[in-house]
Regions:
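Predominantly late transmembrane helices and immediately cytosolic-facing juxtamembrane segments
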Residues: 219, 332-338, 401-436
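Interfacial segments of multi-pass membrane proteins
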Residues: 137, 229, 256, 307-316, ...
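Membrane-interfacial loop-to-helix junctions in multi-pass inner-membrane proteins
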Residues: 16-30, 91-106, 121, 142-163, ...
Length: 478
């Protein structure tokens, strides 16, 4: 078998043995243990027993943390299987498997602890720690200047977290002026913060959401996201888009839970503006890009916009937003891992040199097509149902301007994505290329993601649906 490959994405014979080959299976074992542990915990624990507190109440397991612990560890299992299967075919991954695995495990440790944080400052610190773990991984990418991109990622992340920290300090000032002893424990904040907020409280909320919005890739501070997702190694792109993204979502949900029932109309307006702006920016950029990995990145900006608009609506769209977040994690994992396979064979992220992908890579091409359909919100995938619920919530809220803009921008993204990706998949190649052999082990996690997406669209298992409902209710949903 002969395939085109870059030095960073070598053929199986070029990779050779590595002293640390055991790290691949070890990564999978850790991922299985994490997912199995949280699954058993959920199976043996009634939602009525939650929340449960640990470590002096600094850690908590409630519906929100449990939902995202199950989600990110399920995604991590798929990514770890992919990494393990690629050790024999990628020289760079084989040579750097030990540091990559160590950083990935440190990242997942910070993720799991951060999702359980019952303290806003502790959650903030764990988000920063995940960034510090991922930055060296981004710097190992095969783009033209991966270290520069990693520094940009660190700079934007630090700026967003600094804005969030400034927001927390504004909340502290608000509490001092009102004679309240400020505690950032989530359960204590919910009780202590007065319903009638002052200007310091509003400023703090606005800064926190703006900071977390930039971490999610919401406009206007989104510039770090496309270049980071494109430049990072495939597995790191998936960790960024499908795992770290979710701890930032949890931070936003925690803030909304604490201030539920307060005068937060301005927060809804802030989320609505950032969401609409993000959708508009994503639509324009998707029309212009001819790079399939960067296109997925701009689709992530659009996804953040949809989530922000849904959260701005509040009660009516809460369940749809959570279903969308869960579906989005599986879609981005599927697309980035499949894009990594395309990059390994063709040696480029550009769409122009690619044609007939589905003939050369029948399995990966088909999975990339399925992922594209899921990304665009086709039935029977979970994203379709989630978008319908969000749009229904927007109509119920009476915001027809947001409804019209969201429908228009999603339509533009739909057409532009199809125009860019479908010729790459189905057009006949300029020269004959024999089909490339693909292993079931590499395809297994992607098949798992597709199965999850179909289940979310056709039939969400009752335990997962109950968890989604409880989290939706915690932010004022129904």
């Amino acid at each position: 078998m002969s395939v085109t490959a870059t030095p960073d994405m070598a053929t199986p014979r070029a990779a050779g043995p590595t002293r640390h080959a055991w790290m691949g299976p070890a990564l999978v074992v850790v991922a299985v243990a994490l997912l199995a542990g949280w699954s058993v915990f959920y199976a043996r624990t009634s939602l009525a027993e939650l929340p449960l507190y640990f470590a002096g109440r600094f850690l908590v397991i409630d519906a929100t943390s449990l939902l995202f612990l199950l989600l990110v560890n399920a995604v991590f299992l798929g990514i770890s299987v992919y990494m393990s299967s690629r050790v024999s075919t990628s020289r760079v991954l084989a040579d750097k498997l030990l540091p990559r695995s160590a950083l990935t495990l440190a990242f997942m440790l910070a993720m799991n602890l951060g999702l359980m944080a019952n303290h806003l400052l502790l959650l903030w610190a764990f988000i920063e720690l995940t960034t510090l773990c991922l930055a060296p991984l981004v710097a190992q990418g095969d783009g033209p200047a991966p270290r520069r991109v990693a520094w940009h990622y660190l700079l934007y992340s630090s700026m967003s977290l600094a804005l969030t920290f400034l927001g927390l300090m504004c909340l502290t000032r608000s509490a001092q002026l009102q004679g309240i002893e400020m505690s950032f424990m989530l359960d204590e904040m919910t009780v202590a913060i007065p319903s009638a907020g002052d200007s310091w409280q509003r400023l703090g909320l606005a800064l926190m959401l703006f900071g977390m919005g930039s971490k999610l890739g919401l406009a206007p501070l989104y510039a770090w996201l496309p270049e980071t997702y494109e430049t990072a190694p495939t597995s790191t792109s998936a960790l960024l888009a499908a795992v770290q993204f979710n701890i930032s979502i949890v931070m936003v949900l925690r803030v909304l839970q604490v201030f539920r029932g307060h005068d937060t109309g301005f927060v809804a307006h802030e989320l609505l503006i950032m969401g609409c702006l993000s959708l508009t920016v994503a639509a324009v950029q998707v029309m212009a890009t001819r790079n399939y990995k960067r296109l997925i990145a701009y689709a992530s900006v659009a996804s953040s916009g949809v989530i922000a608009i849904g959260l701005s609506v509040g009660r009516a769209a809460a369940y749809g937003v959570l279903l969308y977040v869960v579906s989005n994690a599986f879609v981005k994992s599927l697309l980035f891992l499949t894009a990594g396979r395309l990059r390994a064979v063709y040696g480029t992220n550009e769409t122009a040199p690619l044609a007939g992908v589905i003939r050369v890579l029948p399995f990966s091409g088909a999975l990339f097509a399925v992922g594209t359909f899921a990304l665009l919100g086709f039935p029977p995938f979970g994203g379709f149902m989630a978008e319908m619920l969000i749009l229904s919530g927007i109509v119920q809220a009476g915001n027809l301007v947001a409804f019209t803009l969201m429908c228009t921008m999603l339509t533009i993204i739909f057409v532009a994505t199809g125009r860019t990706l479908f010729p790459m998949l189905w057009n006949p190649p300029a020269q004959h290329r024999p089909p490339v052999r693909e292993t079931w082990l590499t395809a297994l996690p992607k098949l798992g993601f597709v199965t999850a997406l179909v289940l979310l669209g056709l039939y969400t298992p009752a335990p997962i649906s109950a968890l989604l409902v409880q989290v939706a209710q915690s932010i004022g949903g129904r």
